[in-house]
Amino acid sequence: MSDLLSRRLALLGAAANLPLLTECLHGIERECLRVDSDGKLALTPHPRALGSTLTHPQITTDYSEALLEFITPTETDVADTLGDLERIHRFASSKLDGEYLWSPSMPCELPDEESIPIARYGSSLIGRLKYVYRKGLALRYGKTMQCIAGIHYNFSLPERLWPLLRQAEGSELSERDYQSAAYIALIRNFRRYSWLLMYLFGASPALDAGFLRGRPSQLERLDEHTLYLPYATSLRMSDLGYQNNAQAGLTPCYNDLQSYIDSLRQAVSTPYPPYEKVGTKQDGEWVQLNTNILQIENEYYSSIRPKRVTYTGERPVQALAARGVQYVEVRCLDINPFLPLGIDLDEARFLDAFLLFCAFSDSPLLNGECSDATDNFLAVVKEGRRPGLQLQRRGQPVELKVWANELLERIADTAALLDRARGGEAHAAALAAQRAKVADAELTPSAQVLKVMRERGESFEAFSLRQSREHAEYFRQHPLAAEEQARFEKMASDSLAEQTELERDQDGDFDTFVAAYQASILGLISN
């Protein structure tokens, strides 16, 4: 164990401080496509019974009208978070009217690009802005790529913990700056070690052959309708032969919060010539919000983000600049198609131990390690189960299994501390389940997906549809209690009323609204 990690764990293990570890906050966002009874993309509008996608706090859409997003409230116990997620699934499933929630991350057989419906949010100015932003994504990256689903895991340490560490370490940073620096250090370590998550939880080794739209790739054929890589863990997180040149040069520095903010500010205010050629309007219709490298900050694709809850009308980078980092959003997790929620308690508890390890361990600046971190991540998503696979650690080759076991040995200390804080051995058990996967790659979700498909002679689509139907049956057999159902019904109707009120009460025109939105980031740069 590193000196810094051991000192911090000793400090937090003291009787007076141990309860702090029960105050970590968790939230989960789960995306999933709606599909029809044949496993094809649902072309129906978002079900009105689920409420307004603009104003509902827990049920919305991501890119497509058919790409649902379920958002839990924050909880201190991740078991409660998963309980929240299950209740959202049960309610949504009861309103789908013959449609299913698609079980894996990689999409079903998709119609042609033109026919994939972009999510709509009504006629309010903010609703129209969200729609035009998505039109811009289609223009820049294509609609097909936007139909990939994932799980986002939001995690924060208690606010009371940071002053304790700051004082113990004699830091001269302000409390806010110390907290932000600690979260950025967590992110640096996450970049170093996130390949491990891809090995343990990657669940997308195969995809529908039509997904690539005829583009060349390194993928092999499993059957007439399925492409795969034999040792892949997460094709979702690979490049899939897909590159966006505009973002290729955008590598936000995680040396400190300010440099991260500066790189995003620059990207959302720097024109990109190919986008300039298109312009923001065609035939008088908006096609993208602007012609910059990024339309908005959230367009930047990354495996983890520093976050701060925003005020109404505030942009993410403004919130970070004004009040610092509040939590992290882990964005690289595949949906496990064997699980009704796409994630379970073992995974969540391991993530907590892993993120605490990243937060409390020494985290020097990445500098030359950046390319190694990227290369390791890509190697594992494409061939993480290849026997003897070598990764790069500080410029030296190391076998994945050797490094994985060393990391799990160190993460065991944070898991043990979490178990001391909460009682029981749930985190140690979650860690043991991951050790078993390192010992036997056949236990990983990615290997299990291929094993079942081969044993049953199923294509990716057939496997995924069968899992989707099984999950639908699970939710049908476990309906919400009447009181819970009524609460969700009210949430849905309240959200519809809120959207109607928003559309009725607004004034101003859309062009002015977009200009003001763009000016908010330009104003931040000039300050």
Swiss-Prot record:
Signal peptide: none
Any one Gene Ontology BP term: glutathione biosynthetic process
Record has Cell inner membrane as a keyword: no
GO CC terms: cytosol
InterPro entries noted in UniProt: Gln_synth/guanido_kin_cat_dom, Glu_cys_ligase, Glut_cys_ligase
Single annotated GO MF: ATP binding
Pathways per UniProt: Sulfur metabolism; glutathione biosynthesis; glutathione from L-cysteine and L-glutamate: step 1/2
Record keyword Nucleotide-binding present: yes
Keywords: ATP-binding, Glutathione biosynthesis, Ligase, Nucleotide-binding
Known EC number: 6.3.2.2
Record Gene3D superfamilies: 3.30.590.20
Enzyme superclass (EC): ligase
Catalysed reaction equations from the record: L-cysteine + L-glutamate + ATP = gamma-L-glutamyl-L-cysteine + ADP + phosphate + H(+)
Stored PANTHER family: GLUTAMATE--CYSTEINE LIGASE
Protein family per UniProt: Belongs to the glutamate--cysteine ligase type 1 family. Type 1 subfamily.
Protein's UniProt name: Glutamate--cysteine ligase
